[in-house]
């Protein structure tokens, strides 16, 4: 194991936010005229960027959504995060192992920095990544393009081939693979076939399994 940097996706890897976030996306899309369940939104948009979801919806609808459409969804998400958001079970174990074996960590998410400020703050994970939280807003193209993960590696001063990405979505895992990095898929016990198909080095059901693997 020759990892010199571990890059974590945020939603669904560090914080258990995907179900909460996609509930409000499904409500907003249904109201706009694109009926979709929370489960459907989670399946379709996992790891996606909200501004891109808005653009795709506008193409499907044939008209523009309100300019504050994205901001209103974030406002609802943030309110719910502050009340109910939890960290992913076992993520502290992974971070503890990496700290003990002196492998640096950072965050690379398609979400905006202010969203991570809320989600990582609420779950008390922010201090573990101070100054090392990066967003797709800082690069030209979001995941599944490799731009963000290459940016993370550059900012952290580590060659891509020595980076490990931990992802829960095929979209994000594809970005890590395209960047020339090793990628661990985290399935949370759900169907992991899509993560395997995009080229994850390994796929794990739990964070405890990842912690044990890294500790050996």
PLM regions: where:
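Conserved SAM-binding loop
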Residues: 14, 87, 105-108, 165-166, ...
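Short glycine-rich loop/turn motifs that provide flexible caps or phosphate-binding loops at active sites
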Residues: 11, 46-47, 107, 171, ...
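Short beta->alpha linker loops
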Residues: 45, 49, 73, 86-90, ...
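A generic structural signal for short
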Residues: 13-14, 42-43, 82-83, 104-105, ...
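Asp-based, Mg2+/Mn2+-dependent phosphohydrolase catalytic module
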Residues: 1-4, 96, 112-216
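Short glycine/serine/threonine/alanine-rich loop segments
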Residues: 34, 63, 103, 158, ...
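A generic short-segment signal for beta-strand/edge and adjacent turn/coil regions
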Residues: 11-12, 21-23, 63, 73-76, ...
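N-terminal helical cap/lid subdomain that shapes the substrate entry/recognition surface
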Residues: 2-100
């Amino acid at each position: 194991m020759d990892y010199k940097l571990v890059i974590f996706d945020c939603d669904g890897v560090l914080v258990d936010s995907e179900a909460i976030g996609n509930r409000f996306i499904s409500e907003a899309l249904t109201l706009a005229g694109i009926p979709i369940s929370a489960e459907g939104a989670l399946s379709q948009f996992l790891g996606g960027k909200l501004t891109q979801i808005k653009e795709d919806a506008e193409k499907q609808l044939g008209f523009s959504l309100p300019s504050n459409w994205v901001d209103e969804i974030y406002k609802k998400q943030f309110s719910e995060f502050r009340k109910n958001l939890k960290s992913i079970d076992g993520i502290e174990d992974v971070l503890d192992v990496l700290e003990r074996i002196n492998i640096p960590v950072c965050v690379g998410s398609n979400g905006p920095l202010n969203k991570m400020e809320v989600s990582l703050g609420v779950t008390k994970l922010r201090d573990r990544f101070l100054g090392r939280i990066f967003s797709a807003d800082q690069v030209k193209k979001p995941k599944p393009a490799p731009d963000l993960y290459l940016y993370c590696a550059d900012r952290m001063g580590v060659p891509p081939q020595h980076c490990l990405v931990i992802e829960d979505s095929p979209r994000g895992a594809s970005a890590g693979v395209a960047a020339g990095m090793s990628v661990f898929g985290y399935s949370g016990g759900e169907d992991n076939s899509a993560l395997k198909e995009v080229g994850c080095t390994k796929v794990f059901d739990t964070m405890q399994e990842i912690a044990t693997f890294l500790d050996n």
